[in-house]
UniProtKB/Swiss-Prot annotation:
The gene is MYO1C. It comes from Homo sapiens. The modification N6-methyllysine is found at K383. InterPro entries: IQ_motif_EF-hand-BS, Kinesin_motor_dom_sf, Myosin_head_motor_dom-like, Myosin_TH1, MYSc_Myo1, P-loop_NTPase. Residues 47-731 form the Myosin motor domain. This is Unconventional myosin-Ic. Pfam families: IQ, Myosin_head, Myosin_TH1. The lineage of its organism: Eukaryota, Metazoa, Chordata, Craniata, Vertebrata. GO terms for molecular function: actin filament binding; ATP binding; calmodulin binding; microfilament motor activity; signaling receptor binding; small GTPase binding.
């Protein structure tokens, strides 16, 4: 068989060697550690993960040895059936990460190793699937890890539960309420560096989706005497040290505080201000951030810290006796700070601290206090201020956690998960009223545990007729009755002493106890003890034999602490406080209430009874915490201490009940309702009795006789694996049913949707057919009318406009315009135009002219300046030569060039001679002499003022435009032209005969430059020119086959030019 290995997030390797024999290997820091729960050798080393699997389950030694083995291997969790036993390791084991949470989420209880997260997930799934309120009860001695377990549970729910619709604010507040309550309610004791000095029960509300949507906290009996007194090696509440160590300098200056705790009387009595395991500075940052998360405003934080600082200043108030031995305040500076921080009148506070107000026969009298009484009043005020502030703080947190959607349907379907973190059983060298109340609370919780697990389970078996061998256990009801019994209990006797007239003292209370309960087996005093016991019992002490062991209590302070007396004038002073928190803590209605308030013990007893009712209304889960040693050292296993805790927690009795009993029981109706889908005969409904239906169901599931029993109203299943197998089958069945339901629903949904679409389609079709029919009829009617009007108009089309032909004429006009719009000319050369009807001829002509003008305007707007100049020159050429000179048509498609000679082709001497005159145009020409007509190469330059004829580097002739009288050219295709100058100009030798290959271009540019457009003469036959003073020359032009220029015999210049017939 192949070996399969699986590595899980905790570092364990699961080797599957047999389908029913899982084998685990865990990798530890000290090498490879094998934990094979099914192998004998591994079990000998790490023990079993469920005490139910112990072979010698009745042996206390075997039980403790199993704890030792697992503790040695850092396996701090072990089951007793569904009960989790946790041993405090006093160090971080790295087993609470997100990976661990995911490993335990949604997994059956016994499919994974024991863990607090397994209990958390089981409780959460029961809350969601069965819709029943749940409670996790965490119990154990002080320092056993109860508070840490509560925090881990909250962390698990915050990380793994779905987020509510309105975000994760509730989850954050649930988590952040812990550091705030710990700061104000926890302190270092001899046994625990973070001991809860109050009891806490938290309800977390979940909506139907399983998301946390709200919460509520109940607090019980804050140990307010710790504010003014601490035993040696203990500290006051954390908040005082955190504020001094972590507060900003400005904050401390405003509060009048200094960082040294030794400066405050209330912080030095335990002589333990600094603790290496506590970082007050970092804890302060956590608390400060948490206050913001739970909706504290900056003003509220400032008011709260003012109250905390006022308690420290109260402790530093000192008194001195005057001549009459009455107390007087001697620390004015502290009083000044108190007055400002508490926002009260200084004189009123001074008087309240040194006097007591007494009302006698309707009159108010002030009685001065001696030094002892003034110190008592000061400490009473400090305790009252702090304890009431703590109560206000819990209320503030509850308002922050309250669900905001109480009217929504999802809120009405919420379920509640309760977390109980109560102070553990305490036995100190000096035990007082607070330890008495705390241990009484633990007795009540132990009694509830017995009721819900041991006693109720055995009674249930008997009531259901299940064969059962009774398990003997110690029922601590006798101790609870000793404390709380009406008229005869310790609390009743204490209240009676506190309320009776006369001089009642702690010793008279002890004497009355001795008289009333002297025969009780769990009560002992010095007077009632034998000679040997009296050595360990003082005269002012009594001893109770609790379920957890013997505890000796000193009666000193019992009456004062139970009365919780605060002088009336101190109450009046605090009621006048302008501090918003103080004004809520001290209500003025207290002053007018004549009824004596209930004592502290009675209030605590009533609140415990209420707590027990709350827990009894929920489905409980148990975490039993064990402290391995008193020194808080990791790895140390104190067998004597652990044996004591195992005994008083009743773990062995719980194990024996679990081994002899059944793991699961449920009423027939509920069981059938949950699992009926697994059997075809019971699904979907069962018509007979529920008991018969369950019998059919378990037979179908294949339960063996030893796996279950049928009671009178319930079915009992012995083994968890049987229930897990049933749950697995149900999960598979649910998937199948869900698929069928989804298919049926989808079919129904889409069928309904199809029918709706079909009805809509029929309606739309009907409406559309009617609309089309009406449109068609209207169209036909309109067409008939239109045809009738057109025919009538056509008949009268030549008549003047009248109602009969107006429609036809308008139609004709419209048709013509629409047709014209489609057939408009595309350019100015396009002369096409649709033939208009007779009535539109005038309008058509106007439109044609507008169209042409528009096209011309668009064309002109689109051309560049260079092209515009080109067109202008071409237009001038056309005006001069079109139809008059044979070679003009050949020049039309050729663009005129700005110049035919570059500046590099013109001599620099010529340019220098011209000076600043720019050359507008230059072209090479041939000049003919005036006498012999000899041709000579020249350059013709046009400037803004003259025509310049250049020979190489010499200006031969300059003709100003003013002296240019005209230009002559023949009508043939030759390229000769004559520039005529004034005869009176002595500077000129006569007219100039020139020849240019670009004669049209040259003459056009010359005419434009000289402004002689109208001075160009196009001659036919001959041109006469001035050849010099008193002498004329003639040029004869005759058509021929080719161009020929010669001097004729008659002395004329004969030019033969071919006719191109292009004109």
């Amino acid at each position: 068989m192949a070996l399969q290995v699986e590595l899980v997030p905790t570092g364990e390797i699961i080797r599957v060697v047999h389908p029913h024999r899982p084998c685990k290997l865990a990798l530890g820091s000290d090498g490879v550690r094998v934990t094979m729960e099914s192998a004998l050798t591994a079990r000998d080393r790490v023990g079993v993960q469920d005490f139910v699997l112990l072979e010698n389950f009745t042996s206390e030694a075997a039980f403790i040895e199993n704890l030792r083995r697992r503790f040695r291997e850092n396996l701090i969790y072990t089951y007793i059936g569904p009960v989790l036993v946790s041993v405090n390791p006093y160090r971080d084991l790295q087993i609470y990460s997100r990976q661990h949470m995911e490993r335990y989420r949604g997994v059956s209880f016994y499919e994974v190793p024991p863990h607090l997260f397994a209990v958390a997930d089981t409780v959460y799934r029961a809350l969601r699937t069965e819709r029943r309120d749940q409670a996790v009860m965490i119990s154990g001695e002080s320092g056993a890890g109860k508070t840490e377990a509560t925090k881990r549970l909250l962390q698990f729910y915050a990380e793994t539960c779905p987020a509510p619709e309105r975000g994760g604010a509730v989850r954050d507040r649930l988590l952040q309420s812990n550091p705030v309550l710990e700061a104000f309610g926890n302190a270092k004791t001899l046994r625990n560096d973070n001991s809860s000095r109050f009891g806490k029960y938290m309800d977390v509300q979940f909506d139907f989706k399983g998301a946390p949507v709200g919460g509520h906290i109940l607090s019980y009996l804050l140990e307010k005497s710790r504010v003014v007194h601490q035993n040696h090696g203990e500290r006051n509440f954390h908040i005082f040290y955190q504020l001094l160590e972590g507060g900003e300098e400005e904050t401390l200056r405003r509060l009048g505080l200094e960082r040294n705790p030794q400066s405050y009387l209330y912080l030095v009595k335990g002589q333990c201000a600094k603790v290496s395991s506590i970082n007050d500075k970092s804890d302060w940052k956590v608390v400060r951030k948490a206050l913001t998360v739970i909706d504290f405003t900056e003003d509220e934080v400032e008011d709260l810290l003012s109250i905390v600082a006022s308690v420290l200043h109260l402790g530093n108030i000192h008194f001195a006796a005057n001549e009459e031995s009455n107390a007087q305040v001697t620390t004015e500076n502290q009083l000044k700070y108190l007055t400002r921080l508490l926002s009260v009148e200084g004189s009123t506070l001074r008087e309240a601290l040194t006097h007591r107000k007494i009302i006698a026969k309707g009159e108010e009298l002030l009685s001065p206090l001696n030094l002892e009484q003034a110190a008592y009043a000061r400490d009473a005020l400090a305790k009252a201020v702090y304890s009431r502030t703590f109560t206000w703080l819990v209320g503030k947190i509850n308002r922050s956690l309250a669900s905001k959607d109480v009217e929504s349907p999802s809120w009405r379907s919420t379920t509640v998960l309760g977390l109980l973190d109560i102070y553990g059983f305490e036995v100190f060298q000096h035990n007082s009223f607070e330890q008495f109340c705390i241990n009484y609370c633990n007795e009540k919780l132990q009694q509830l545990f017995i009721e819900l697990t041991l006693k109720s389970e055995q009674e249930e078996y008997e009531a259901e007729g299940i064969a059962w061998e009774p398990v003997q256990y110690f029922n601590n009801k006798i101790i609870c009755d000793l404390v709380e019994e009406k008229f005869k209990g310790i609390i009743s006797i204490l209240d009676e002493e506190c309320l009776r007239p006369g001089e009642a003292t702690d010793l008279t209370f002890l004497e009355k106890l001795e008289d009333t309960v002297k025969h009780h087996p769990h009560f002992l005093t010095h007077k009632l003890a034998d000679q040997r016991t009296r050595k360990s019992l003082g005269r002012g002490e009594f001893r109770l034999l609790h379920y957890a062991g013997e505890v000796t209590y000193s009666v000193t302070g019992f009456l004062d602490k139970n009365n919780d007396l605060l002088f009336r004038n101190l109450k009046e002073t605090m009621c006048s406080s302008k501090n918003p928190i103080m004004s809520q803590c001290f209500d003025r209605s207290e002053l007018s209430d004549k009824k004596r308030p209930e004592t502290v013990a009675t209030q605590f007893k009533m609140s415990l009874l209420q707590l027990v009712e709350i827990l009894q209304s929920k489905e409980p889960a148990y975490v039993r915490c064990i402290k391995p040693n008193d020194a808080k050292q990791p790895g140390r296993f104190d067998e004597v201490l652990i044996r004591h805790q195992v005994k008083y927690l009743g773990l062995l009795e719980n194990l024996r009940v679990r081994r002899a009993g059944f793991a699961y029981r449920r009423k027939y109706e509920a069981f059938l309702q949950r699992y009926k889908s697994l059997c075809p005969e019971t699904w979907p409904t069962w018509a007979g009795r529920p008991q018969d239906g369950v019998a059919v169901l378990v037979r179908h599931l294949g339960y063996k006789p030893e796996e279950y029993k049928m009671g009178r109203t319930k079915i009992f299943i012995r083994f968890p694996k049987t229930l897990f197998a049933t749950e697995d089958a149900l999960e598979v069945r649910r998937q199948s049913l869900a698929t069928k339901i989804q298919a049926a629903w989808r079919g129904f949904h889409w069928r309904q949707k199809f029918l709706r679409v079909k009805r809509s389609a029929i309606c739309i079709q009907s409406w559309w057919r009617g609309t089309l029919g009406r449109r068609k009829a209207a169209k036909r009617k309109w067409a008939a009318q239109t045809i009738r009007r057109l025919i009538r108009g056509f008949v009268l089309r030549h008549a003047p406009r009248c109602p009969e032909n107006a429609f036809f004429l308008d139609h004709v006009r419209t048709s013509f315009l629409l047709n014209l719009r489609r057939q408009l000319p595309q350019n100015v050369l396009d002369t096409s135009w649709p033939t208009p009807p007779p009535a539109l001829r005038e309008a058509s002509e106007l439109l044609r002219e507008l169209c042409i003008k528009n096209m011309v305007w668009k064309y002109c707007r689109s051309i560049s300046p260079e092209w515009k100049q080109q067109l202008q020159q071409k237009a001038v050429a056309s005006e001069i030569f079109k139809g008059k000179k044979d070679n003009y048509p050949q020049s039309v498609p050729r663009l005129f060039i700005s110049t035919r000679l570059g500046t590099d082709e013109i001599s620099p001497r010529v340019l220098q001679a011209l000076g600043s005159e720019p050359i507008q145009y230059a072209v090479p020409v041939v000049k003919y002499d005036r006498k012999g007509y000899k041709p000579r190469s020249r350059q013709l330059l046009l400037t803004p003022n003259a025509v310049v004829i250049v020979e190489d580097a010499k200006v031969k002739q300059r003709i100003d435009y003013a002296n240019l009288t005209g230009i002559s050219v023949s009508s043939l295709s030759d390229s000769l032209f004559v520039l005529h100058v004034q005869r009176a100009d002595n500077k000129q030798k006569g007219d100039v005969v020139l020849q240019s290959d670009h004669v049209i271009e040259t003459l056009t540019k010359t005419a434009l430059s000289a402004n002689r457009v109208n001075s160009i003469n196009i001659n036919q036959g001959s041109i006469t020119f001035a050849g010099g003073p008193g002498r004329d020359g003639t040029i004869d032009f005759t058509p021929g086959s080719e161009l020929l220029i010669t001097k004729a015999k008659n002395g004329h210049l004969a030019v033969v030019a071919p006719r191109l017939n292009s004109r």
